[in-house]
Structure formats: C-alpha cells, structure tokens
C-alpha cells in the first residue's frame, strides 16, 4: 500500500513537473513567437516606412509635375492673354493713327476752306469797293458829260451804262481768273503729289490684243489635213468654235480670225491639240473642242483667283471670280481690261491710303469697276448697268456698287472711294501707250472737236492738235474782247465736256490777235 502511494505521489510529482516543464516550454515558445512577431512587425514597419518614404517621394514628384504643368498652363494662358491684349493694343494704336490721319486731313481741308472763304471775302470787299468807285465815276462822268457835251440825260445814261458794263465785265473776268488760278494752284499741287506717288508705286503690263491669232504648224502638209476631205474638218472646227480659219500661202502657219477672244483661244487650244495628236477628223475635233472648253473654264477661274490674289483681296463669290477672269480675254481700245482693272485697283488703294480711307474696300471697288465688260457682248445694256447688276446679285458692298455705277458719271458718287475709282480709271486709261483707237474713230473725234469750237460766235477757225489733247481757237478781234475770250474758253470747255467722250483732258486755248499795218512813203 505504501508502494502504491509512493507510485501515486511519484506520478503526481512527475505530472506536476511535466506541467511545469510544459508551461516553461510553452512560455519560451510563446516568447519566441512574440519575438518573431516583434521582428516581423518591425520588418513590416520598416518596410512600411520605406514604402511610405518612397510613396512620399512619388507623391512629391507627382505634385511637382502637376505644379509644373499647372504653372506652364497658367503661363501659356497668361502669354495668350498678353498676346490678345497686345493685338488689341495694336488695333487701338492703328485706329488712333487712322483717326489722327483723318483729323489731320479734316484740319487741312478746314484750313483750305477758311483760306478760300477769306479770299472770297477779300474779293467780295474789293468788288464792293470797285462798285463804289464805279458809281462815283459814273456820277462824275454824268455831270461832266452834261456840262461839256450838253448831252441829254438819256444819252448820257446810255453811254455811262455801256462803259459801266464793260468795266464790270473786266472786273468779272479778273475775279474769275484769280479764283480759278488760286483753286487750280492748290488742287493741282495736291493732286499731282497724290497721283505721282500712286503711279510710282503701281506698275502693270498692258498687252494690246488683236482680232487674229497665228498657230504655227510643223509643216505645210498639215494644212491639207486641217482642211480635210471636201473641207469637212475646217467646216466642223469653224462651226463648233465660231472662229474663221484662214489658210493661205503663209508657210507653216494658220490664222484664226474672230472678235471673241475666248472663242479664239478655244480654237487655238483645239487646233494645237489636234496637231499634237495627229488624228484630225470631225468626231475628234468635237471631242477636242469640248476638252478645250473645260480647260478654258478652269483657266479663267485660275486667272480670276490670281487677279484677286495680286490685288490683296481674300474673299469673293466663286462665280464673280470666274466672271473677273473673263476680263483677261476682253480688250478696250487695245487695253487688256483685266490688267487695266488690276492697275485701277492698285492706284485706288494707294490714293485711299493717302486719304485715310479703307484700302481693301477701295481695291475691291477698283478691281470690279469694269466687271460688266465681261458680259456686255452677251447681255443687253451698258457695261456699267451690267456691272451694277452683277455686284448687287453677288451681294457686294454698297460702296463697290456705287463705284461701279458712278465711274463714268451715270449716277452720282456717294463716297470718296467712288471718286478715287473714277480718277484711277482715267489715269490708267489716259496714260501714254495704254490705249489705242482706230483711225476712223480718231478722225471723227477730231472733226467733232473742231466743229464744237467753230459753232461759237466770234470764232474765226480752230485747230485740234496734239492728237486731240488740245484745241486752239482763233477768234475775230473785232467781235471778241480780251475779257470775253476768258469767258469763251470756259464755254468751249463746258460744251466739249457735255458732247464728247474722251480719255484724259483736252486743253482749250483761245487766241485773240490784233494787227495794225501802216506803210511809210
């Protein structure tokens, strides 16, 4: 029994010791787990700190990038705004300069008007003084005549009135001369300055078109192929193009004759294509004519676009551009109308710039002033009426329409640009070499000029000289006085302006000559 108790105690002790050892081992294992956990946690913390530092750097870099990008956007926006502000400032400066130029022009015109009014006031005062002197002189002469000649009151009055009339005619002629000379001096000085500068800054080639075109052939055998069997080829070509083909003894050449330059050009293009192709028969001729017409339409469009580009106009209705291109194949007195229109546009733009007007609008009006000539042989009416209708149809500005309608005086000019277009048109048409007239028209104009001057009372005879640029009027000295000669020159000038159409100016010179001959014996 003691042994059993001892075993039980031993077992209990062993169990207690086992529990103790197990507890100790479990505690150590737990401590090891805690140490491992601490190490793991420490590693995680260190890793987290590293990742946090890395993320922090990335966030800082991203923030810096965003800040830099935002700053760049702000700077670009500020730069754009500064540019807009600068553009607005430049526009304001240009407007101020334009206003200054207009103010200067107005001031100059006001000063000129004041000077003219002052001169007129002085002349009016002088006229009053002269009239007072005349009245005094009349009274003195009346008394003297009654005392010395013992004339009746009516006779004396008639003599005095006749002499007074002669004196007043003399005074009127003097005042007219002084006023005209003063106005002409100022106007000529200003106009010459503007026109000279405009002409120096503008240059345009003028090519005198004819009514025939010569096509060169590779050999004379080609003439027979162009004529064709029984003349079928030449008849087909003439029928389709409306142009006469003249085939004569001229070596290696065919002459195309016609008054429509566009048809003549289509015929030339067709004939050259046929010669190059070698196949010449009615069907091929018809095909080539159609092809040449299409090429001609494209060429006309390109010519119109080049014209507005040369002038500096950027927008225009496509149909109006094509009509403008047709002017290249239209002539007036031998002057190419498109080149003339470009020259007028440049001259008008230069003059408008000098006067502070809208340069682009002035060029547009100058370029389109003769647009009606492109269709005047197809549509009834004058080229001015057709031009106004075209400009209205394609919604051109009112200033352009008025310039087209008024450049020949058909309607009243309502703007300065319209006046400048008419002046530039006259400058371009009247300069030497720009235009040529037929001999018949030239002779008729000279005869008409002389007949107008010979129709005035007191004119002995007249001579048109300088190719019709001047007319010299010889008057009868016993019928026309010196003072009346001045008035006669003005009347002849007005009559010429009313009855004749001519480019440029015509100088009227009245010559009064008195000769006294005596013979010594």
From Swiss-Prot:
Q: Does the keyword Membrane apply?
A: yes
Where are the annotated segments for Disordered?
Answer: 77-107
User: What GO biological process terms does the UniProt entry carry, in alphabetical order?
Assistant: mRNA catabolic process
One Pfam family recorded for the sequence: RNase_Y_N
Q: What is its main location?
A: membrane
A single Gene Ontology MF term assigned here is: RNA endonuclease activity
Topology term for the membrane: Single-pass membrane protein
Q: Which UniProt keywords apply?
A: Cell membrane, Endonuclease, Hydrolase, Membrane, Nuclease, RNA-binding, Transmembrane, Transmembrane helix
Q: So which residues are the signal peptide here?
A: none
Relate the protein's function as given in its record: Endoribonuclease that initiates mRNA decay.
The UniProt entry's sequence similarity note says: Belongs to the RNase Y family.
Q: Know the name of this protein?
A: Ribonuclease Y
Q: Which organism is it from?
A: Latilactobacillus sakei subsp. sakei (strain 23K)
